Swiss-Prot record:
Listed EC numbers: 3.1.11.6
Catalytic activity: Exonucleolytic cleavage in either 5'- to 3'- or 3'- to 5'-direction to yield nucleoside 5'-phosphates
Protein name according to UniProt: Exodeoxyribonuclease 7 large subunit
Organism: Pseudoalteromonas atlantica (strain T6c / ATCC BAA-1087)
Keyword Nuclease tagged: yes
Function per UniProt: Bidirectionally degrades single-stranded DNA into large acid-insoluble oligonucleotides, which are then degraded further into small acid-soluble oligonucleotides.
Length: 444
């Protein structure tokens, strides 16, 4: 039956045969796409995944090494329907026929990704992702609205972070389904309710991690438009850092996780104290600068007030009156001296003529003229004194000091004269100035 001589036999070792089989499989069949169900899934401590791919008639062992499986957003579990791209191979030490998986995605995820890219392109063309449509976060946030599941881990993470950073901030929850067929409509309705109530400063819209199908409600077009039309600023917080949704592109700010969203919208107590300290220092500096400016203005106004004070004006008027009186007196004295000299000259001439009657007549005339001149001089002096007295009386009449001396007072508010009761209000501090001092009082 076995006629071949030993010399003509091509004898393999087991390892060589397995190696040859592996080479043939890898070179002849190469890479394949496979639709199957996950079974016997094991995640090794090395980071590699080992599982079985099966359908209702057959199964094949599979391995997905760490470098490839780190690209998978959601770890598969028993019973998951998946689509894989793999290389057919043999594990030589045991001769196990297996697949080396390079890419794995939930079955149907490819279609979802194509829908995602198409909607993303359409909404971008309509301007929903433009930076000019995004609102800035408020400077001061005291109330935060959260649109998410009331029982999900995302809400717990958000509340934990807010309690740690700023326990005083108020949180209003808008319970919403965040997975399933009705989720997108509920998310839109919650955003609409939050805007109608207008009871928060900002909204966090999101949920925890999951598969592409789990997060799909945040890729719906109606959710994108609800976020776009929101008057309240919205921070998206969907899944993990690697999860990107349409809601992230439309939102005013994207946070990689719900916890990160809480960090972004809350101000820690240390930050608040630092900000308040900086504001206090700026206020103190500005107040000192303002007080210095007001002090300089007060000094300037005081100097100007002293220049135009009625007392100084009266002194100047009195000095001018004294100068005028001196000039009048000097003028009258000069005229009298000249008249006397004229009389003396005439008397001398008359005495030289010697007629006694003429001399007597001239003497009488001299006496009469002298008397008239004296009377005229006296009347002139009296009239000047009377005018001076009238001028002094008039100055005393118009002087505020004279008014104060008669029992009156002048009321000031903020260094300005109060001219009417309409200038005063309850609580105003006023100053009443009298002839001998001043008092301060408060208007009741």
């Amino acid at each position: 039956m076995f006629s071949a001589s030993p010399a003509n036999r091509n004898i393999f070792t087991v390892s060589k045969l397995n190696h040859l089989a592996r080479s043939v499989l890898e070179s002849e069949i190469g890479q394949v796409w496979l639709s199957a169900e996950i079974s016997n899934f094991v995640a090794a401590s090395s980071g590699h995944w080992y599982f079985t791919l099966k359908d209702n008639r057959a199964q094949i062992k599979s391995a997905m090494f760490k470098g490839a499986n780190r690209k998978v957003m959601t770890r598969p579990k028993e019973g998951d329907k998946v689509l894989v791209q793999a290389n057919l191979s043999i594990y030589e030490p045991r001769g196990d026929y297996q697949l080396i998986v390079e890419h794995l995605e939930p079955e149907g995820e490819g279609q979802l990704k194509r829908q995602f890219e198409a909607l993303k392109l359409a909404l971008s063309a309509q301007g929903l992702f433009a930076n000019e449509n995004k609102q800035p976060l408020p400077d001061s946030i005291s109330r935060i609205g959260v649109v998410t599941s009331a029982t999900g881990a995302a809400l717990h993470d958000i509340l934990t972070v807010l309690k740690r950073r700023n326990p005083a901030v108020e949180v209003i929850i808008y319970p919403t389904q965040v997975q399933g067929a009705n989720a997108s409509r509920q998310i839109c309705r919650s955003i609409e309710i939050a805007n109608q109530r207008n009871e928060v400063d900002i909204l966090i819209v999101g949920r925890g991690g999951g598969s592409l199908e789990d997060l799909w409600c945040f890729n719906e077009e109606n959710v994108a438009w609800a976020i776009h039309y929101s008057v309240l600023p919205i921070v998206s917080a969907v899944g993990h850092e690697v999860d990107i949704t349409i809601a992230d592109f439309v939102a005013d700010l994207r946070a990689p996780t719900p916890s990160a969203a809480a960090e972004l919208v809350s101000q820690s107590q240390i930050e608040m104290l630092s900000a308040l300290t900086a504001k206090r220092d700026r206020l103190y500096k500005n107040t000192r600068t303002l007080l210095k400016e007001l002090h300089y203005q007060q000094q300037s106004l005081t100097q100007e007030l002293n220049t135009y004070h009625p007392k100084n004006q009266l002194r100047q008027h009195m000095q001018r009156v004294d100068n005028q009186l001196t000039a009048i007196t000097h003028n009258m004295t000069t005229r009298l001296m000249r008249a006397k000299q004229t009389c003396d000259s005439r008397i001398s001439k008359l005495s030289q003529l010697s007629p006694k009657a003429l001399l007597k007549e001239q003497q009488n005339t001299h006496n009469l003229l002298s008397q008239r001149l004296t009377q005229a001089w006296r009347r002139g002096v009296e009239q000047r004194h009377l005018k001076l007295a009238n001028a002094s009386h008039l100055l005393d009449t118009v002087s505020p000091l004279s008014t104060l001396a008669r029992g009156y007072s002048i009321t000031f508010k903020n260094d300005k004269v109060v001219k009417s009761q309409k200038d005063l209000a309850k609580g105003d501090v006023i100053t009443n100035r009298f002839a001998d001092g001043e008092t301060k009082s408060t208007v009741n």
